[in-house]
Amino acid sequence: MALLTPLTRDEVAPDLVSLWDECERVYPDFRHLWATMAHSPIVIRHVWGQLLDLKRESPVDARHFEIAILVVSHVTRCDYCVSHHTPRALGTGLTTAQVEYLATVGGASVDANGTVGQHPGFDGDESLVIDLARFILWAGMRAPAAGVAPRVVHDLRRRLFDRLAARFSPRQIEELIWRTTQCVAFNWHNDLLELDPEAEVTLVTRDANHG
């Protein structure tokens, strides 16, 4: 049972009702998440206002966002996000085999180029998004724990950025990085509050053997 009870529409401030209604229209399956965040008017206004803006206006392919989100959500073991984003990823055209691959690739070792080599079944841009998501997790969580020298992390970061800059615009890079790192925050938020999936959402358990 969730530690915070999601609010109802009648419980939010009048100036949040229009945002609430848009969340209900665009993200009905995430109701427990945004209705919980509504305990803070600041959080729901800025976080969900931003997510709605990104959905409307971002030049980043929705498939790329879903790839990054699934990679990090499996590693951080967020059942809520995995359960919600697995069908969304499939809805962008990813195959079941590709989605299953994303459940395992986050735990692979980073090589000298910050990659795991070829990502079977994914094109060049998609593979680069996988490498970005993996690097964010590795640099922020695993490298410090493993005692990897900061200079090594710095060099790998620069190589990865050069690859990103060759394929994506500065705006796309910023929005990819922001949305991926933001997903980690969502993962930890949901875990800490023991957020329950909505009744209509099929629970997809993350792969506990990886990450």
Predicted features, each with a name:
Residues 1-211:
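Hydrophobic alpha-helical segments
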